[in-house]
Swiss-Prot record:
Tissue: Expressed by the venom duct.
Subcellular location: Secreted
Keyword Signal on entry: yes
Propeptide: 23-49
Signal peptide feature range: 1-22
Name under which the protein is recorded: Conotoxin Gm5.2
One Gene Ontology CC term in the entry: extracellular region
Family the UniProt entry places it in: Belongs to the conotoxin T superfamily.
PTM annotation (Serine amide): residues: 60
Keyword rRNA-binding: no
Amino acid sequence: MRCLPVFVILLLLIASAPSVDAQPKTKDDVPLAPLHDNIRSTLQTLRKKVCCRPVQDCCSGK
């Protein structure tokens, strides 16, 4: 029973320790922000091609 509080405190300290990247960055690493922007613009283009017809009003920003 004496070890339980010590064990809990150690677990809390380990959980709050700053994490370290397991692999160092290389020059080939690409930031994810430009990839998300590309995906977003591609999805917008596809949405316009699929649902922007005169009968449908999905292009109005709804």
